Amino acid sequence: PPPHPPSSAASDVYKRQAGKNAIGRVDLVENRFIGIKSRGVYETPGGTLLMHAHRAIESVTLDKDTMHKKEQAMPRYAELIYNGYWFSKERFKLQRIVDLKRKKVNGSVKLRLYKGNIIIHSRITKSPAYSMKKVSFEENKTFNKSNVERFINYHKKKLK
């Protein structure tokens, strides 16, 4: 898989295919920075495909805590950019975090497009955090079922 976004020619193909399948169009009312609401209709079929593909690879390469921290940081990151704070110290700090996390995210994704839906067909990566062998309870030698009670008791304390 390429280490950079696809070429312009490939991007045009993605945009056309996504557009034919009604992907990437959003109609929304936004809360503007200056305190008013405005309606916008945006069409980004190629960008929507790239976002779904990137998230599909993130889901198998990033661990739980990293994913959680990323999901918490991204709304703030987007808000800073939307409000014109591209050169702010806060945006630079968030960018450093994003860049560190992104080093683990690599691979390729096959997507199927059908009537407005993006279906993940396959994901391949050289640095998976996910392993089918580790999550199989039937044949898993690393998962000891007798530890379940201790695990539950430990986490139950958080509820008291």
Residue ranges and their predicted role:
Residues 13:
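Active-site loops and adjacent core secondary-structure elements that bind or stabilize anionic groups
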Residues 18-160:
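Peripheral terminal appendages
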